[in-house]
Amino acid sequence: MPHQQMLILFGLLPVATNISTWWNFGSMLLTCSALQVMTGFSLSMHYTANINLAFCSIIHITRDVPHGWVMQNLHAIGASMFFICIYMYIARGLYYGSYLNKETWLSGTTLLIMLMATAFFGYVLPWGQMSFWAATVITNLLTAIPYLGTTMTTWLWGGFAINDPTLTRFFALHFILPFGIISVSSIHIMLLHEDGSGNPLGTNSDIDKIPFHPYHTYKDILMISIMIITLLLTVSFFPDIMNDPENFSKANPLVTPQHIKPEWYFLFAYGILRSIPNKLGGALALVMSIMILFTMPFTHTSPMRSLTFRPLMQFMFWTLVATFVIITWTATKPVEPPFTTISQVASIIYFTFFMSNPILGWLENKITKHN
């Protein structure tokens, strides 16, 4: 009887008995989101969106504001933790066929794009050397768009170069986008619980479900605790581990850093961009590296949902993971051989995974029917 009442109370949350730890990342992302909003709100009270004062305001926060250094480092390292969780969440979705819940997957991919935009705007705000030059390089890609590119870039910058209006609007966007993320997250969660989550076997779990609370609540609390402990240990002992040394210097438009690169969580897309020696081609590849996730629900041809019983796609999946790491690594290196060649080969393999999905599904059908 208590279990029935609990199921009624959490009526939208009957969950498969066999979901593993890979299903805990949703609650971890929700925790990250709440942490980022709270620390970001605290930081915004002391931040000044002005090119002459932004860098000084960050120093003021870390030195003079009570516990400001904790807030600043929690926000910066929390962003990295957010992306670690979201990349693992996407990897789980690809492996276990979560993309077959079309609406949930499409809303989730939209969330990823919004999150990347928010993180990019946030990276510019300290107005350090790497912040300024990363913003210059990435926003300048808009000029590759035929006819409209130059006008769009001037509109985004608020002038003919990155200046005070650019920083002001980036701060405004960085502040407002998280509220959009929260709204789309709510839609994402509602869509997810309309169909119900999958399970490692990729089978229908309607006949074997248990209430979310208390069984999965404790699993979630355990993983959230591990994440928060890791975050606090990093903030306490290695607060600058994710920072670029160039960003400890104030932005100087007259001095170009030897090697311009964005934060680590954008390096895979940046590596794909750099691997193509053409501005428009590189910009298209950069956009497609994310947008190609939208195609997954429409290119699935296998009768099996999960990769658990699909060895060919399993091989391609782990190749994709290795490729992701390799592109991230090559993007930190100078644009010279052998790094350019490695990056180009890895980029081709990255897109091959998504293109091979329907072909390997069809091939597996043939092999299964033949046997």
UniProtKB/Swiss-Prot annotation:
Q: Where are the transmembrane segments?
A: 25-45, 69-90, 105-125, 170-190, 218-238, 280-300, 312-332, 339-358
Query: What cofactor is this protein dependent on?
Result: heme b
Which residues does a ubiquinone bind? 193
Which keywords label this protein? Electron transport, Heme, Iron, Membrane, Metal-binding, Mitochondrion, Mitochondrion inner membrane, Respiratory chain, Transmembrane, Transmembrane helix, Transport, Ubiquinone
For this UniProt entry, what's an example GO CC term?
A: respiratory chain complex III
Pfam families the UniProt entry points to: Cytochrom_B_C, Cytochrome_B
Give the InterPro entries listed for this entry. Answer: Cyt_b/b6_C, Cyt_b/b6_C_sf, Cyt_b/b6_N, Cytb/b6-like_sf, Cytochrome_b, Cytochrome_b_C_euk/bac, Cytochrome_b_N_euk/bac, Di-haem_cyt_TM
State one molecular function term (GO): ubiquinol-cytochrome-c reductase activity
Binding of heme b b566 occurs at 188
Membrane topology, as annotated, equals: Multi-pass membrane protein
Q: What is its main location?
A: mitochondrion
Protein residues bound to heme b b562: 75, 174
Entries under PROSITE patterns matching the protein: CYTB_CTER, CYTB_NTER
Q: Where in the cell is it found?
A: Mitochondrion inner membrane
Its function?
Component of the ubiquinol-cytochrome c reductase complex (complex III or cytochrome b-c1 complex) that is part of the mitochondrial respiratory chain. The b-c1 complex mediates electron transfer from ubiquinol to cytochrome c. Contributes to the generation of a proton gradient across the mitochondrial membrane that is then used for ATP synthesis.
Q: Which PANTHER family match?
A: CYTOCHROME B
Similarity annotation: Belongs to the cytochrome b family.
| Miscellaneous comment as given in the Swiss-Prot or TrEMBL entry | Heme 1 (or BL or b562) is low-potential and absorbs at about 562 nm, and heme 2 (or BH or b566) is high-potential and absorbs at about 566 nm.
Q: How does it assemble?
A: The cytochrome bc1 complex contains 3 respiratory subunits (MT-CYB, CYC1 and UQCRFS1), 2 core proteins (UQCRC1 and UQCRC2) and probably 6 low-molecular weight proteins.
Instruction: Supply the name of the protein.
Output: Cytochrome b
Q: Which organism is it from?
A: Candoia aspera (New Guinea boa)
